[in-house]
Regions:
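Membrane-water interface at transmembrane helix exits
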Residues: 33, 88-92, 96, 118, ...
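Hydrophobic transmembrane alpha-helices of multi-pass small-molecule transport proteins
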Residues: 75, 79-84, 110-121
């Protein structure tokens, strides 16, 4: 029953993101956090699913990608991912654990909950932004995608306030998010021992669902 709920949720949320360019990822994240008991698996699985969804949207709207924005975002994203990896390594070293999965405190689920509350109730409308903001937001997104899972609500105001066309928002934002989700795969593989291939029976139906929903 839980698998069916996740498959339906994956399809509907990917369809939502395909239509308006945002909102689907964090909705799916919240549903997965309720059903899947372990926080790091929520983020790891969600990352793979959203990687497929975002790559599909990027491909469909590829002619509308804003390359200069992506370049600025990538400049900040890589340091953000490296900083995330360094923090996880530091935590495992400090607590003397073989894997980050062995950390006694499951901090990821509370972080997801706080993030969703912020997105729904506390987020304020941003004012006009500069082009350099994409670099700094890349750093923040590199941390958020690892420790929370969904960075869409963080970076969405940049695209909206940049007055891009709808198609450009969908394509460029999807490309940025895809890069973040791709970048965290080795982090969860190395530090949390997440074996994506061993979990194919869980992930494959969800991946197919988001692909169909996006198309």
């Amino acid at each position: 029953m839980e698998s069916i709920v996740l498959i339906i949720a994956a399809f509907l949320t990917s369809f939502l993101s395909a239509v308006i360019g945002m909102g689907g990822g964090i909705t799916l994240l919240g549903i997965m956090a309720i059903i899947i008991p372990t926080g790091y698996l929520v983020v790891a699985y969600h990352g793979i699913i959203q990687l497929v969804s975002n790559i599909t949207r990027t491909t469909v709207y590829r002619q509308h990608i804003d390359i200069p924005i992506i370049k600025r975002f990538f400049i900040g994203l890589l340091p953000g991912l490296l900083l995330s990896a360094a923090m996880i390594y530091g935590a495992t070293t400090y607590f003397n654990t073989l894997s980050a999965a062995d950390l006694k405190i499951d901090f990821l689920k509370p972080a997801i909950g706080v993030y969703i509350i912020w997105f729904l109730y506390l987020k304020k409308k941003k004012k006009a932004i500069s082009k350099e903001s994409y670099k700094w937001m890349g750093v923040v997104a590199g941390i958020a995608t690892v420790f929370i899972g969904a960075m869409g609500p963080l970076i969405a105001p940049l695209f909206i306030n940049d007055k891009l066309k709808k198609e450009s928002i969908i394509a460029t934002k999807a490309a940025c998010q895809a890069a973040g989700h791709l970048g965290k795969i080795p982090i969860f593989f190395l530090f949390f021992n997440v074996s994506y291939l061993d979990d194919w029976s869980v992930l494959l139906p969800l991946i197919i669902a988001v692909y169909i929903g996006t198309k």
